From Swiss-Prot:
It catalyses: N-formimidoyl-L-glutamate + H2O = formamide + L-glutamate. One of its GO terms (biological process) is putrescine biosynthetic process from arginine, via agmatine. Mn(2+) 1 binds at residues 124, 153, 157, 244. It comes from Bordetella bronchiseptica (strain ATCC BAA-588 / NCTC 13252 / RB50) (Alcaligenes bronchisepticus). Its cofactor is Mn(2+). Belongs to the arginase family. InterPro entries: HutG (IPR005923), Ureohydrolase (IPR006035), Ureohydrolase_dom_sf (IPR023696), Ureohydrolase_Mn_BS (IPR020855). HAMAP family: Formimidoylglutam. This is Formimidoylglutamase. Mn(2+) 2 binds at residues 153, 155, 244, 246.
Length: 317
């Protein structure tokens, strides 16, 4: 495991300073090699696909943090005044557990500084590291308010096999919470019946998960879903939002390990994410499973960049 912060060459964008008005883009407001402060928007990369390999998936997600940053660089800053790039946690070979531990430490430090982090993955093994970071920060504060783990995903990722992989993070979170007496609030929205065995549905029921299948996550159901989400938010003190890009239709997000033949429209995914952000309870978000090795015209990286931009506060609701 190593930590890298060599993304200066990625943060480049056109210069429209000769035009009237605010022409800033994210590349013009990014802070490299600087500590995050209170209220700062921050991105942190998790360059890892060791968990995907362990889960018999297609490697390539380790390339995603750089690809997503490249698509973010030219986006207009709008409401953002400063964006801290906290670098990448890089997984060496199969040292997944060390990388997840390092990610947890970096996430906890950003939260302690008062920053608002979005983590750019990487395989969905990112979730186990992200959650541990949030939990470390809360534990250091003596905060035992319930945490809603909200996963927008075609898969439950509740596999019980070990060692951990991209298919196990929410089972690892469930075990962690059970061992420490924390209530687990796990919701998985966008579940594909084609991508989950009866055993995984049974495990979801066992851990008390709330789930909605992809066919009920279409635009026609948005009002019902937001009302359901409001009930979940009301019961939580904090929210960890994780978006697996394979929840989107393959035409929208072709560059993932397991493309979805049906999927949840981007408009719905984005509206759910913004609804969570507007609640004031979002502490941490991450984007998982972007795989540049299989992307088409940077389509998936562009979608990830848009979602990161919205989550960081790039545009008013």
């Amino acid at each position: 495991m190593s930590v890298a912060n060599d993304s200066a060459s990625i943060w480049t964008a056109r210069d429209d300073s000769g035009e009237r008005g605010d022409t800033r883009r994210l590349a013009h407001i990014v802070a490299l090699g600087q500590d995050a402060g209170a209220g700062d928007a921050a991105v942190l990369g998790f360059a890892c696909d060791a968990g995907v390999a362990r889960n018999q998936g297609r490697r390539g997600a380790a390339l995603a943090p750089r690809a997503i940053r490249r698509m973010m660089a030219g986006l207009p800053a709008h409401n953002l005044r400063r964006l801290v790039d906290a670098g990448d946690v890089v997984c060496e070979d199969d040292q997944l557990e060390a990388a997840q531990d390092a990610l947890a430490g970096r996430v906890a430090a950003l939260l302690q500084a008062g920053a608002h982090p979005v983590v750019l993955g990487g395989g969905h093994e990112i979730a186990w590291g992200s959650f541990q970071g949030l939990r470390r920060w809360l534990d250091a504060r003596g905060d035992r308010e319930p945490v809603l783990v909200l996963n927008l995903d075609a898969h439950f990722d509740l596999r019980t096999g070990r060692p951990g992989s991209s298919g196990t993070p929410f089972d690892q979170i469930a075990e962690y919470c059970a061992a420490r007496g924390h209530a687990l609030q796990y919701a998985c929205l966008g579940v594909s019946p084609l991508g989950n065995t009866p055993a995984l549905y049974a495990r979801a029921a066992e851990v008390g998960a709330v789930w909605v299948e992809d066919r009920h996550m279409q635009e026609a159901h948005l009002g019902e879903r937001l009302a359901q989400l409001d009930a979940l938010l009301a019961a939580a003190g904090h929210v960890y939002l994780t978006i697996d890009l394979d929840v989107l239709p393959a035409a929208t997000a072709p560059g993932v390990s397991a493309p979805a033949p049906y999927g949840v429209p981007l408009a719905v995914v984005e509206e759910v994410a913004m609804h969570v952000r507007a609640s004031g309870k979002l502490r941490l978000a991450d984007l998982a499973e972007c795989n540049p090795a299989y992307d088409i015209d940077h389509r998936t990286a562009r979608v990830a960049a848009r979602l990161a931009w919205r989550l960081l506060g790039g545009a008013a609701r």
